[in-house]
Amino acid sequence: MQHNQLLEQLYSGHSLSTSESTALFNAVIQGELSNEQIAAMLIALKVREANTEEIAGAVAASLQNAKVFPRPDYPFADIVGTGGDGQNTINISTASAIVAASMGAKVAKHGNRSVSSKSGASDVLTALGVNVNVTPEQARQALDEIGVCFLFAQQYHSGFRHVAPVRAALKTHTIFNILGPLINPARPTYHLLGVYAPELVKTYAETAVALEHQHSFVVHGSGLDEVALHGETQVAEIKNGKIEYFTLTPEDFGLKTQSLESLRGGEPQKNAQYLTALLQGKGKAEHANTVAANTALLLKLFGYDDLKQNVQNVLAHLLSGKAFETLQKLTTY
């Protein structure tokens, strides 16, 4: 079907199948649509709310057009959020990825520049001295040798440049805000995915099933796209094609409730200071606890099922300063 027919289908309020969505997003990523067509399409999908098939199709097109990453055959994970929760916190997922790697897990973190906060994953890593523009081969080498690598979205999904001016002009959430975590070019075995709105938990979970994720968690923590300690975290666990929904409280991690305010971050330089202190075992207790809770859930994907024990192990590990050594090694690639 031609793009125009697919667009017409959207304009008339009809949804697209996965294959139709893949075809349309292929056209977008390959620069075959005008800015006006892209804008109209994004708004049509926003007004009706994109369904699982449409999101899965957009993910498929993104991965088909992505720069290739030499995928390892050992199990590895991604921990990544949509961003856009408007909370301006420290970089929790980035810290958790480094901590988990220094404890023996393998993490290929997909990330980008800031969406709505002052400091996205690549912003803070750059401030920490990490080269976010390494080649896929160098990134793979880091994953092999130190257990963690960072895949900069703009480097792998260059076709998204066709959408950038439209997204900037629209100034509103679109389907592209929810694609990021789902389009890691390394195609991880496991995923811990944070979403900025509670209603996205179900959408994401169903999309993860459609994408045949082996084992994933989708989380929304009382306004955060992370596991929260200031309130409840809504969770969807996707395993072998089935979804289980539940909530987690700070008590489930053996931790006390703490304020969201205690996680406020700042510019990349400020967040880099917070992360350095944390990884050296000298950070704020609230930062350590939040990263421990998120890392604990990430480790569960690797078969470490006891969240409270995981938290204790992470907190002890942070005090050892070994996580900072992993960060220092990451800066050498």
Curated annotation (Swiss-Prot):
Pathway(s) annotated for this protein in UniProt: Amino-acid biosynthesis; L-tryptophan biosynthesis; L-tryptophan from chorismate: step 2/5
Amino acids binding Mg(2+) 1: S93, E226
Transferase found in the keyword field: yes
Entries under SUPFAM superfamilies matching the protein: Nucleoside phosphorylase/phosphoribosyltransferase catalytic domain, Nucleoside phosphorylase/phosphoribosyltransferase N-terminal domain
Residues annotated for 5-phospho-alpha-D-ribose 1-diphosphate binding in this entry: 81, 84-85, 89, 91-94, 109-117, 121
Cofactor dependence: Mg(2+)
Any GO BP: L-tryptophan biosynthetic process
Binding site for anthranilate 1: G81, N112
E.C. no: 2.4.2.18
Free-text comment on the cofactor: Binds 2 magnesium ions per monomer.
Annotated binding of anthranilate 2, by residue: R167
A molecular function (GO) term: anthranilate phosphoribosyltransferase activity
Complexes and interactors: Homodimer.
Function of the molecule: Catalyzes the transfer of the phosphoribosyl group of 5-phosphorylribose-1-pyrophosphate (PRPP) to anthranilate to yield N-(5'-phosphoribosyl)-anthranilate (PRA).
HAMAP family: TrpD (MF_00211)
Family classification: Belongs to the anthranilate phosphoribosyltransferase family.
UniProt name for this protein: Anthranilate phosphoribosyltransferase
